[in-house]
Every structure is written in C-alpha cells, then in structure tokens.
Amino acid sequence: PIHIPLPKISGRKRQKKFLKRLSDTISKLELSNSNNNYYFSYKEVNFKDMIFNKIRKNILPAMCDIHTQSTYLDKLLKQKRPTIIISNTSGGVFSILGDLSSLYGIPSLMIPQGSHVPPKNEYEMIEWKEHGLCLMNTPYRYLAVQSPWARAYLEKVPTKSKQIITGPLLFTSIENNKNRKTLLREKIIPEHKDDVILVHASTPKGRSMRLYVYERPDEYIENINSLIRAVETIENMHLIIRMRPLNYMKMFMLTEDVRDLLIQSDCYSIHSEGSFEDYLSIADMIVSYSSTTIEEALQNKVPVLQYDSQGKYCHIE
C-alpha cells in the first residue's frame, strides 16, 4: 500500500479567500442576531459570546483544514482514478471522499470500525443516529454489515447505502489455542498467569460526545473503582484495565491520570501497550460499558459482563 498524506496548507491565496468568506459569514450571522438573544440564551443565561468564540477558535480552523485537504483529495482522485474506495469512517475529510467518489462514479465501500446496536429508547436513538453519520449513514455507495446488531440497527435507522452482509471484517479474531493463551499470560501477567482474568475494555468519551451510550470520564473511573472493590474480595482473580493507546486516550484521559484516580490495590493492573487481540486471548471475561470490544468478545465466544454501576445503559440485550 502507498500512504499519501493530505497536507493542511494549500495555496495561500485560495486558503485566505476561503477563510475570508467564512469569517464574513460568521460576522453577518453574529450581527443579524445582535439584538435578538432568543436563540442564544437559556433560563436567562446568555451564551452567545461562547458560541461565536467556539466557532471562530475551533470550528472555523477545522473547516479550513477540511477544505484544503478536500482540494488535494479532488486532484488525487482525478489523477489516480482508483477502481474502488474503501474507508472505515466517514468523519471529516473522509465524508468528502465519499461525496467525491459519487461525483466521479467510483464505487465506494464503508466498513464501519465501531459497534452499532438498535436503539431501545429516544435517548439512545438520538445518540446512535448521530454516531451513525460517521459510520452507517454515509455518502459511500456500499456498506459492510458485520454483525446481527448492525443489521438490527439499520432496521431502525435505514441507510441509502447498499447493504452487503459480510460478517466481521475489522473485528478482532483470536485463535482458540490453549498453548498460545498460556504463553501470552506468561508474557503479559506472569505473576497472575493462573488467576481468573477479567479484562476491562471500555470506550470513555468526552462530556460533549454521546454522554448516554458511552461513559463520561467520571463514570469510567467510578465504574472501574466499583469493579476493583468487588475483585478485591475474590481470591485468585485479577483485573486488567485495558486502556487505548496514548494517541487515542490523550483526547480524554492519560494513563497517569487514570492511575491517580483509581483505588490503590494489588488486584488490578493497567495496560495500554500491545494489541487488543492478545488481551482478548488471555481473558476469562471481558468487562465493558459500551464498546466494539463487546461485539469482538461475543464473536470470539469470550464471556462478557456489561457493567454500569448506575444501571442506566445496556449496550446489547
């Protein structure tokens, strides 16, 4: 495979022109509502300045980056004319990639990287529908349906993409091999190789990102601490807290921060290195609130405990 990075800076004149158009539009919007706070207040609290500050400092630069990258992407597709375009997400510039593939008549396939389950109430519907805009309801012509839960989701939230029932393509697959399991345990947790191993693998999100179907950082910590208290009372059991690699988790919490917030105990250890496949292979049970790891475990016939100490959400019923 050839990796072609998309630069964030194109021709200076083009970039300045696009930035000026956006800035002018934002200024007009702000001025048009200068005497009308109806849309920018709640219970007599005005948040207009906060909104426009967010637009100028965060949204506008992101839009400029996507605009620049889409320009290069357009040129790249015109030059290379690929036979097919395959992506695992449709967020940001990858959404533009799906649109351009339709524009140029290039077949495109979305293979979602995340878990999707059928919404069970109005709150889950709001968040899973939003989540689906990057993975299930996208501009890509074809959609790989990798699990029965994804299919059930699409029955409630239809997509314009043509569905292809593929089974798991991106999910982790492990060997049912006792010797390999033993060797991995000796390598990863030699002092607990003979214990019952629980692997906690969940996906916390920031407070602004789907705060119902995923754990907020504070809930993530509370749920793990609750588990630690339980595991401490059971002999010959060890809890592995599997965290995402640093480049992912730094968006929400660093390993050092999590370590500082957890109860001190010898019954658990924190791991962020190595592949999830290895940890799934050594687990007697996966523990999670909401994550693709739940589906990956079930696909590999590893028992799963869906754990929410508050009892508000159940990922798969």
Provide a role label for each language-model segment.
Residues 1-173:
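Active-site and donor-binding regions of nucleotide-sugar-utilizing enzymes
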Residues 69-71, 219, 242-300:
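Donor nucleotide-activated moiety binding/catalytic core segment of transferases
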Residues 83-84, 142, 196, 238, ...:
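Structural motif
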Residues 86-91, 111-113, 144-147, 200-201, ...:
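Short His-Asn-centered micro-motif
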Residues 94, 118-119, 150-154, 173-174, ...:
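Short, charged/polar "capping" segments at the starts of alpha-helices
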Residues 102-103, 232-233, 298:
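Anion (oxyanion) recognition and catalysis
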Residues 112, 158-165, 252-265, 292-317:
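Catalytic binding pocket for nucleotide-activated donors in carbohydrate/polymer assembly enzymes
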Residues 166-258:
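Conserved catalytic-core segment of nucleotide-activated headgroup transferases in glycan assembly
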